[in-house]
Amino acid sequence: MRGEFYQQLTNDLETARAEGLFKEERIITSAQQADITVADGSHVINFCANNYLGLANHPDLIAAAKAGMDSHGFGMASVRFICGTQDSHKELEQKLAAFLGMEDAILYSSCFDANGGLFETLLGAEDAIISDALNHASIIDGVRLCKAKRYRYANNDMQELEARLKEAREAGAHHVLIATDGVFSMDGVIANLKGVCNLADKYDALVMVDDSHAVGFVGENGRGSHEYCDVMGRVDIITGTLGKALGGASGGYTAARKEVVEWLRQRSRPYLFSNSLAPAIVAASIKVLEMVEAGSELRDRLWANARQFREQMSAAGFTLAGADHAIIPVMLGDAVVAQKFARELQKEGIYVTGFFYPVVPKGQARIRTQMSAAHTPEQITRAVEAFTRIGKQLGVIA
């Protein structure tokens, strides 16, 4: 039986390769930035990182991280409730809460952990969760761990969300929570949070938003999709990451009212049984929030880059998904074409990744480009020119 198990895995891997669905990990030998070095020593322009504000290799963050290690050490060798809470952890939690307009915040090792430890902790069998169909895998997995009755609604479809809310209430649900991404990361679409909050008010439901692809750069002050949609103060729970716009390292958080956060500290298993966030990351994250609040220069540069890329790619004839976001998916349809396109682009010095099933539905393969404040206008033009040449070679555009 053991031999059969390993043979099955071997067969599945071979099938994935044959169908063009096998994901290869490419090696980077430099720091994460707009211009990176790959394993063969060549330099390429990176258009597939979550490095929205270009801070992943910023000297001020590196200095803050080093200072954090000098003052608070390398690691805590403990979970938070035993001997793993430093003053800097509390400072970061307070700053995150204030920045997001929430009462309190709690740190996790990742946003995956924040979502994984949220629903089961707060809701029981008599409750209901209504989740957007395109929510991140961490929300999906977190919901699966919860005993609450589960409902799903079509992406951003307020009519279907209302139908599910009616179902939950008619079934006698005690507490009802609507869970949605703030930005749907495969499409670059911002959630209709105003519609969600209006329905939540109508049906007395809670609202939870995973804002990993928004906090730091979406909204007038970069506070996230709830600021962009003008619903600050109407979202009950916000989860997010420190691993994208806010420095790009690792770490996650949940922000909510104090009683929610305090209960998570008592019962959320990923929080209780994971080591504390490293002092270097905590110190750098505090610095990031200071930089984001200091001005809009990085956000302005990011949005200018996103506009330039979208306009030039549309003019070249490409089909693009999303709108009003730094995620700009180039739709290709076929998984094999997406992978070949990405390989050819790397030969041209443009570093991207093809996304295909099971990450996206079959027939909706794409190259998800992501703009950064670190990109220059010249780098964006160079990328569009490379896309255009290869797109014509592969018959994607005329």
Residue ranges and their predicted role:
Residues 9-74, 205:
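N-terminal "arm"/small-domain region of PLP-dependent enzymes with the aminotransferase-like
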Residues 59, 63-67, 71, 98, ...:
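PLP-dependent enzyme catalytic core of the Aspartate aminotransferase-like
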Residues 118-137:
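Conserved PLP-anchoring active-site segment centered on the Schiff-base-forming lysine
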Residues 125, 145-147, 203, 234:
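Short, structured coil segments at secondary-structure junctions
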Residues 203-206, 213, 218-324, 337:
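Active-site C-terminal subdomain of aminotransferase-like
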Residues 300-309, 314-349, 359, 363-364, ...:
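Conserved PLP-binding catalytic core of the aspartate aminotransferase-like
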